[in-house]
Structure formats: structure tokens, C-alpha cells
Amino acid sequence: MARYLGPKLKLSRREGTDLFLKSGVRAIESKCRNRLDVAPGQHGARKPRLSDYGSQLREKQKVRRIYGILERQFRNYYTEANRLKGNTGENLLVLLEGRLDNVVYRMGFAATRAEARQLVSHKSIVVNGRVVNIPSYQVSVDDVVTVREKSKKQARIKASLELASQREKPTWLEVDAVKMEGVFKRTPERSDLSADINEHLIVELYSK
């Protein structure tokens, strides 16, 4: 399955919520003119009642799109989450949050996860003193994530940090915006993450 390259706002409208795919320079609700609850397309205003399977599928698609992950990779994350001890749904979210591209985004070095993925792929990110260019790399507790020295002058990184300063900072991360460096202090708990995600529906979908 190819990665989606079309309009980002269309995906948010498809899921009926802000997927945080845009930089945040302008509120997505403003740009969509309060159309987030209207699906894209000619018949978008019609909202058919979803079956249980339909609701489960929509939730999976929403989370997959938030983190920018293809179907096969997402299923692999679920398999790993199911193998680990504890709640499978929560394990899944923790694995997704531990991706290097997501951590780079959460630390404020990139305005979107897609931009963070690009920074990682272009070797602009260092983990524990070593360049890592794999977006799916799993960050561990106490890992130090830094913007590579020669990349610190990039205007987009500085702009992203400015945007991040206006958002609530994740409590499981410690970030020094001046040094462009952060520490993955602890594994996030479910209460730290979005309440707008219903991971139980995803577990039900894959458990069939």
C-alpha cells in the first residue's frame, strides 16, 4: 500500500477530528470552516450509522493516520503489543509513541510527524551520540535525542520549537530548546495520551 500524498485536511475530515497532520500555524478548524464533521466528497454531509466493524475500522484508520503508518507496519505493532505483558491497546499506543519520528515531533523539533520523519530520514537526528535515520527506531527510557549540529540552523526546526513552546509539553519528555536536545524520561502512561483515541476498538478489530 502506497503512502497517502493527497490533501491532509481531507484525511482529518474523513475521520471527523483533527489528526494533527498540519503544522498548527493556522487552526485546522478555521481552515475547514467547521467542516470537520462533514466527510469529504459529494455525499460527505450524509453520515451513515456505522456497524461495530465499521467503528472499529474507522478507529484503526484514524490512529494509523495520526502516526503516519502503513497497514502492514501497523499490524506488526499490534502483534508486538499483543505479545507484551499488560493491556494490548495501551501497549500499542506506547509502541507508537516510542517511535523516533514521533518523539522528535513531541519534543518540538518538527511541526508534524511527517516533517519529523523527514528530519530522521535525512540524518538530522542523533540518539545517544549516534546518527539514526530510521523513523521507526524505538526510543528507550533515558535515551538522549538531539538535533544534529549542522542541522540546528534550519529555519523550520526553529519555527517548530517556537510553535511547540505554545503547546502543553509532554510530561514524559525533558526538552532543552536552546540546545535542541531532549531526554525520553519515562514510558508514557495511558493518562498522558489522547483521550480521543479508543484503542479498545482496534483490539476488538484485530482479535477477530
Swiss-Prot record:
Residues 98-158 form the S4 RNA-binding domain. The keyword Isomerase does not apply. SUPFAM superfamilies: Alpha-L RNA-binding motif (SSF55174). GO terms for molecular function: rRNA binding; structural constituent of ribosome. SMART domains: Ribosomal_S4, S4. Keywords: Ribonucleoprotein, Ribosomal protein, RNA-binding, rRNA-binding. PROSITE patterns: RIBOSOMAL_S4, S4. One of its GO terms (biological process) is ribosomal small subunit biogenesis. It comes from the Bacteria. GO terms for cellular component: small ribosomal subunit. Belongs to the universal ribosomal protein uS4 family. One of the primary rRNA binding proteins, it binds directly to 16S rRNA where it nucleates assembly of the body of the 30S subunit. With S5 and S12 plays an important role in translational accuracy. Part of the 30S ribosomal subunit. Contacts protein S5. The interaction surface between S4 and S5 is involved in control of translational fidelity. HAMAP family: Ribosomal_uS4_B. This is Small ribosomal subunit protein uS4.
